[in-house]
């Protein structure tokens, strides 16, 4: 059963990440359609007959599930320190939620951070015909901060696993004495 839970968690991480990516890219599409229509869509070969929001969501899913794989591997592997299978399942799920929460929080912070109005350097990496370079850069910033938040969330998740393991171990010692 423990092996089944371990494998299920490894599968769950990229699935949850896909949902996160879909929602994340729907929100960033609202900020800058140009980021997708003039930049991201060129990197993916989705049918042009699809609605732009559907294509944006699919891009978010494709990018996020790939990020969910290493996060899931690390958090699930560290979760194996818990001897109890139920704790492995629930504590690892908590770390997944923590990771997605941190990624979301950092993305939200980035959405409200000022973008420099002198955007000449950033313009070099943009397509030429961008009408709203500030919104475009805001989406770039949100994406970058989301990844940083995910990494910080994963590190906090590792710490949470260790903290819960020590807490449970101390409780077991107290019970036995």
Predicted regions and their residues:
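Alpha-helical transmembrane segments of polytopic integral membrane proteins
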Residues: 20, 24, 29, 68-72, ...
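N-terminal membrane topogenic signal
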Residues: 1-10
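Perimembrane loop-to-helix junctions flanking transmembrane segments
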Residues: 33-52
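Short, membrane-exposed interhelical loops at transmembrane-helix boundaries
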Residues: 43-44, 121-139
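Cytoplasmic juxtamembrane regions at transmembrane-helix boundaries
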Residues: 72-97, 161-177
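Hydrophobic alpha-helical transmembrane segments
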Residues: 50-67, 132-155
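Hydrophobic alpha-helical membrane-insertion segments
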Residues: 10-25, 93-114
């Amino acid at each position: 059963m423990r092996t089944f839970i371990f494998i299920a968690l490894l599968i769950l991480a990229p699935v949850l990440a896909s949902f996160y990516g879909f929602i994340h890219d729907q929100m960033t599409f609202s900020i800058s359609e140009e980021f997708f229509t003039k930049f991201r869509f060129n990197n993916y070969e989705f049918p042009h007959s699809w609605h732009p929001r559907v294509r944006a969501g699919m891009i978010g899913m494709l990018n996020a599930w790939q990020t969910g794989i290493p996060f899931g591997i690390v958090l699930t592997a560290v979760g194996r320190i818990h001897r109890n299978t139920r704790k492995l399942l629930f504590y690892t799920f908590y770390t997944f939620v923590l990771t997605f929460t941190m990624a979301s929080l950092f993305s939200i912070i980035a959405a409200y951070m000022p973008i420099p109005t002198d955007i000449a350097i950033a313009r070099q990496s943009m397509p030429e015909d961008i009408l709203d370079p500030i919104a475009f850069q805001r989406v770039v910033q949100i994406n970058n901060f989301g990844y940083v938040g995910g990494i910080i969330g994963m590190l906090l998740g590792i710490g949470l696993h260790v903290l819960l393991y020590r807490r449970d171990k101390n409780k077991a010692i107290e019970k036995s004495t």
